Amino acid sequence: MKLMIASDIHGSAYWCKKMLEAFEQNGAERLILLGDILYHGPRNDLPKEYAPKQVIAMLNPLKDKLLCVRGNCDTEVDQMVLDFPVMAEYAYICCDNLRIFATHGHKYNCTNLPPLSKGDILLHGHTHVPVIKDCGDYTLSLIHI
């Protein structure tokens, strides 16, 4: 199964559109969103084309293709307008003999690891800096759109 992974849209219609174009062009079957979907948070500047309602309108039709976890800027109010679950702190994904631990990164990350087994993959966003790192027994991937 082909997965696309993104994080930290922060309500940007511009980056959401770019992400969905890449999702379509690459023929991915599922889109994993690692949190911070609609709100930019009090410490961050407004992202390019900040338009949470447009992001909602773009993502809701894809609800059956999305797997999302909660970011530190996501709240219960966001869940009220999104047609797909966004409140889980993490998700285990088993795909093509891989076990993936997907989380936002504000709780579990490379300095505070979740329970991982040899060969597992840890996905998280939050840092806004993309990184893929082989850590011996597991692989660390920090994602940002």
Segments the model singles out, each with a brief description of its role:
Residues 1-3, 93-100, 134-140:
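Beta-strand-turn-beta hairpins that frame and shape the catalytic cleft
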Residues 2-95:
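Core catalytic region of metal-dependent phosphoesterases/phosphodiesterases
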Residues 8-9, 102-108, 120-130:
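Histidine-centered catalytic micro-motifs
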Residues 64-67, 99-100, 120-121:
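Short active-site oxyanion
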Residues 77-82, 112-117, 131-137:
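Short loop/helix-cap segments at secondary-structure boundaries that form the rim of catalytic
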Residues 82-117:
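Repeat-unit-sized solenoid/scaffold elements
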Residues 143-145:
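Conserved small/polar residues in nucleotide/adenosyl-binding loops
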